[in-house]
């Protein structure tokens, strides 16, 4: 059913990806107090410069044998513009690129797939984007915990009913967030 699409999936997909945008900005500001970006490329640079393995993290869907790498291939390059400023260009996950096509060109027919973009608001992309939001929020939560509550190692209190993410090498535990 990964290809199943609906109007409800469009709403969920847009809400999830919008929330990624909303969460990423203050998270990057928490990581770098001088952060001023507001685009996915700026978030990519900020997060992956600190967490080199962020894009390689696997999120597991509980009660199913499904693993997702929601930020797979998330990387960036920089180029110097004629005005002397650095421009960050990111290679974004497929689900983010699809989200933007649905957001801006919903009824346009994809040359590649011969489908209108809204039909790509499917179960697969909703699940990938939700796993990406889970990972982003988990990293943000961990950063806040380490900064403001470093002695409280019992956080979070409630496990997620949907996802798990192992963050090895830093804490060596399974962090599970509701």
Stretches found by the model and what they are:
Residues 1-15:
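Charged alpha-helical initiation segments
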Residues 1-2, 30, 106, 140:
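Secondary-structure edge/capping motif, primarily at the C-terminal ends of alpha-helices
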Residues 9, 20-25, 148:
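OB-fold ssDNA-binding interfaces and closely related basic DNA-contact patches used
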Residues 11-18, 94, 121-128:
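Aromatic- and histidine-enriched alpha-helix N-cap/loop-to-helix transition segments
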Residues 21-97, 104-109:
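Short non-catalytic regulatory patches outside canonical folded cores
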Residues 94, 103-116, 137-148:
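Substrate-binding/catalytic groove segments of enzymes
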Residues 118-163:
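Amphipathic, Lys/Arg-enriched alpha-helical patches that create a basic surface
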Residues 158-178:
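Acidic, Ser/Thr-rich low-complexity intrinsically disordered segments
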């Amino acid at each position: 059913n990964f290809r199943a699409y609906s109007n409800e999936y469009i709403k969920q997909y847009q809400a999830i990806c919008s929330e990624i945008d909303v969460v990423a900005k203050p998270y990057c500001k928490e990581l770098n107090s001088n952060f001023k970006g507001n685009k996915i490329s700026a978030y990519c640079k900020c997060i992956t410069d600190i967490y080199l393995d962020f894009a390689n993290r696997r999120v597991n869907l509980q009660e199913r044998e499904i693993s997702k790498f929601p930020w797979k291939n998330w990387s960036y390059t920089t180029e110097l513009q004629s005005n002397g400023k650095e421009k960050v260009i990111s290679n974004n996950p497929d689900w983010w690129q699809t989200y933007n096509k649905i957001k801006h060109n919903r009824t346009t027919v994809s040359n590649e797939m011969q489908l209108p973009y809204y039909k790509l608001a499917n179960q697969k992309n909703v699940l990938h984007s939700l796993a990406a939001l889970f990972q982003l929020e988990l990293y943000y939560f961990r950063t806040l915990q380490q900064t403001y509550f470093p002695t409280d190692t019992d956080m979070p209190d409630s496990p997620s009913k949907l996802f798990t993410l192992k963050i090895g090498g830093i804490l060596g535990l399974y962090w599970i967030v509701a």
